[in-house]
Amino acid sequence: MATLDPPPPPPPPITKYTNLADPTNPYRLETSYNPGTVLVTELLTVENFSTWSRSIHRALRAKNKLGFLNGTLTKPSDPHNPLFELWERCNDMVVSWLQNSISLPLRSFVPFVDDAHLLWTELQERFSPQNGPRIYELKKTLATLTQDEDSVNTY
């Protein structure tokens, strides 16, 4: 008598987030999306956080990725969750877009953060207009940078 194998477990339910054919799905990455893309024409400087942040919001809203910035789309805690890998891929794309939208002199002042929402929060704390003393400190640091004996590449 042959033994029957138990049936395989059912696939996880298709939710609005796992249906990548849905153009409104925030986890959908279009083929035209590239981690090297600069989202806005005006890069972040110490003076322009307000206008820059509005431009970033518009760009990410247009790409349906604003939830990664404002924290409404959070990383699933279970690595077996079908959204875990999707979240990581989209979050990495948003982090890359943010980093590419920061002027070169400021990139060294921006911490390496793997979470788009945490990076956004850090940028707000450092560069928002109500943080005048920090902006002054950054301008002063930038104004006093010297090459010394470093090569141009190192500098």
Q: Which stretches of residues belong to each language-model region?
A:
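N-terminal Lys/Arg-enriched interaction segments
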Residues: 1-155
